[in-house]
């Protein structure tokens, strides 16, 4: 095959793959597919649909985010999730939301959403929002104090955090372009995994003594 034909075939393949690369969740093929969370069928990129006759009449509405969460936690924050597990009506629609409430000095620790881009608005108070670039972008920290009514954007897969820098309670609402964005809390992943990451791996990676690693593991033995 000549060079021009090879190039044409390659370009055609790229064009075919482009929609899949650009999309997050798969596009729906029906108006509604209320998730059957109790179904026995194997689910791939979504859940089986309930028959509409069994879906009820409230699957498009939720009041779950109307109530503040309890911030009496070790992190001083509370995350109220509204993904497909909590709102089955979002199944196949490629969207979900969270509400996060913060006590003064509370934090939403460094974490990653592996399957979604995040956009958020601060509803009350003021939050330091930090986004960490990847190594090929210089491992740069992008941060700003975001106040009530202001918004922020977090690209898919980048580590980020929020911290209440105000003297009063704060809250934010965020949305994702996935019904199940996933979350990886960095401290819990490193020091509370099951089974644990071997201590020598962490001592070498973090350049600390074994006693420091064991202390940190003890802090996360019970999870968050």
UniProtKB/Swiss-Prot annotation:
Q: Which UniProt keywords apply?
A: Apoplast, Cell wall, Disulfide bond, Glycoprotein, Manganese, Metal-binding, Oxidoreductase, Secreted, Signal, Stress response
Q: Which residues form the signal peptide?
A: 1-23
Locate the Cupin type-1 domain: which residues?
Answer: 63-214
- Locate the residues binding Mn(2+): 111, 113, 118, 160
Q: What class of enzyme is it?
A: oxidoreductase
GO cellular component assignments: apoplast
Q: How is it modified after translation?
A: Glycosylated. A form called G contains antennary GlcNAc residues, whereas a form called G' lacks antennary GlcNAc residues in its otherwise identical glycans.
Cysteines joined through disulfide linkages: 33-49
Induction context: By salt stress.
Family membership = Belongs to the germin family.
Which organism is this entry from? Answer: Hordeum vulgare
User: In which tissues does this protein get expressed?
Assistant: Root.
Protein name according to UniProt: Oxalate oxidase 2
List the EC numbers from the record. 1.2.3.4
Lineage, broadest ranks: Eukaryota, Viridiplantae, Streptophyta, Embryophyta, Tracheophyta
Instruction: Relate the protein's function as given in its record.
Output: Releases hydrogen peroxide in the apoplast. May play an important role in several aspects of plant growth and defense mechanisms.
Assembly and binders? Oligomer (believed to be a pentamer but probably hexamer).
Catalytic reactions of this protein: oxalate + O2 + 2 H(+) = H2O2 + 2 CO2
Under Pfam families, the record lists: Cupin_1 (PF00190)
**GO molecular function (one):** oxalate oxidase activity
Q: What is its main location?
A: secreted
């Amino acid at each position: 095959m000549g060079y021009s034909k090879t190039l044409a075939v390659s370009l055609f393949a790229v064009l075919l793959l482009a929609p899949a690369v650009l999309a997050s969740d798969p596009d729906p093929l029906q108006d509604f597919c209320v998730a059957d969370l109790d179904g026995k069928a194997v689910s791939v990129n979504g859940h089986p649909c309930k028959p509409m006759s069994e879906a009820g009449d409230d699957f498009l509405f939720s009041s779950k985010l109307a109530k503040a969460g309890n911030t009496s936690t070790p992190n001083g924050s509370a995350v109220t999730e509204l993904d497909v597990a909590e709102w089955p009506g979002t199944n196949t629609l490629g969207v979900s939301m969270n509400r996060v409430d913060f006590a003064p000095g509370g934090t939403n620790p460094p974490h990653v959403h592996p399957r979604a881009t995040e956009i958020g608005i601060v509803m009350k108070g003021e939050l330091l929002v930090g986004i960490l670039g990847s190594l090929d972008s210089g491992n740069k920290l992008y941060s700003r104090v975001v106040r009530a009514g202001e918004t922020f954007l977090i690209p898919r897969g980048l580590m980020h955090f929020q911290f209440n820098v105000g003297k009063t309670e704060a809250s934010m609402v965020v949305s994702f372009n996935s019904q199940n964005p996933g979350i990886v809390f960095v401290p819990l992943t490193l020091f509370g995994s099951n089974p644990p990451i071997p201590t020598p791996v962490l001592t070498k990676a973090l350049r600390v003594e074994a006693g420091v690693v064991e202390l940190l593991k003890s802090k996360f033995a019970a999870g968050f």
